[in-house]
Amino acid sequence: MYKRYKVVSLFSGCGGLDLGLTQSDFDIIWSNDIEKSVIDTYEHNIGHIVQKDIKQIHTNDIPNCDVITAGFPCQPFSSAGIRKGIEDDRGNLFKECIRVIDAKQPKVVIFENVRGILSTKNLDGSLLIDTIVHLLETLQPGYDVNYQLLKAHDYGVPQKRYRVIFVAFRKDLNIQYEFPKPTHASDDLSLTLGHVLDIPPHVPNQDDVWELSPQAKQLVPYINEGGSWLDIPYSVLPERMKRIRDDMKRYRSPVFYRRYSKNEISGTITAAATPEKCGILHPTKNRRYSVREIARIQSFPNDFIFIGQSLPKIYKMIGNAVPPRLAKVIANSISKTLQQHHI
C-alpha cells in the first residue's frame, strides 16, 4: 500500500501546485496565502486555507509535515513585469519560507518560480538563487538542493511555459534526486490549441470572458489565425504603434496582439492577460480566451471551478499558478524516490 505524505503549502495561490500533489501521494494538511481573491477558489477545490500574512504566522501554528511547498511571489523576478528583484519587499519573502522550514524540518522542500529568478541579483551583486541554495544547505540538518528550468510542455502541459523547480531532500536521508525525464514530444498533437479548446457544452467558467478594451476591439478583427499586429493595416494603428512599425529595428521587432493558430502550442499564460502582449486571443473568435480556456491551457481539469467577482483577478490567479499536470509529474517522482528509500 502506498504511503501518503503530509504537505504544508505556503503561498498557495489558487491551488495549481497543491492539486497536482493531491493527484499523487500527498495530502495538504495546512495552506496559506494572503491574497483574498484566491481564497474562495482554493477552498472550493482543495480545502481550508489560512488567509494571513506569512510574516505574522508563528511556526507553532503550523503543523509538522513531510513536505513544505512554496511558490513565493514571482512578480519581482518575472520578465513579464518590472524586474525589481531583491529590492522589492516581495522578493524577500523566501526568507519566511526558510524560517518555517527551519522550524518544521520537513523531509522534502519544493519551491517554484519563474525563470527570471536564475538571473536575479542581490544588492551586493551576488545571485539570489545562490543565496536560496546556501540558506537551505546550511540549515540543521540541512538540505541537498536540486533545481532545474523545466519546460511545462515536456510534461504534457499544452503551453510553452518555463518554470524553475527546486526539490530539496533533507541531508540525513542521503537521497540523490533526479528530475523526471520528459513525457511528451514537442510535436505532440494533444498539446495544440485545437485539441485543448475543444470544450464540451456547459463546462463551468466557459462563459466567463474578460471583455476586450475599445482599442483591442477595433484592432483584433484584422488579425488572422496564427497572425499578429503585423496583419493590422497601418492606417488604423494607434500613433504609438505606427512609430514602432516605422522603425522596427530600433524597437527590436516586438510582437503585439499575437493570435496563435489551432495547430500551435500556446505561449505562456501570464498573470497580466493583456491581449496586446500576452498572446491570449482566441484563434478564430475576436475575444480573449475564456476563463475555462486558459485554465485548460494551464492543465486544470474541467471540474476545477474558479470563483470570484473580478474576472481580471481570476485570469491573474490562473496565470500565476503552477500547471497541475507539471506538479503531478514532480510529485510522482518525489513520492517514488521516498518509497524507494522506504521513507
Give residue ranges: language-model regions.
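Class I S-adenosyl-L-methionine
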Residues: 57-65, 79-255
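The conserved SAM/SAH-binding core of class I Rossmann-like methyltransferase domains
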Residues: 31-32
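A short, Lys/Arg-enriched amphipathic alpha-helix followed by its capping loop at the start of a domain
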Residues: 3, 20-27
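Conserved proline-anchored active-site loop of SAM-dependent methyltransferases
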Residues: 7-21, 54, 64-81, 108-114, ...
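Conserved SAM-binding strand-loop segment of SAM-dependent methyltransferases
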Residues: 47-54
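Conserved SAM-binding loop
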Residues: 42
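Conserved SAM/SAH-binding beta-strand->alpha-helix loop
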Residues: 35
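C-terminal target-recognition/interaction regions appended to catalytic cores
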Residues: 214-343
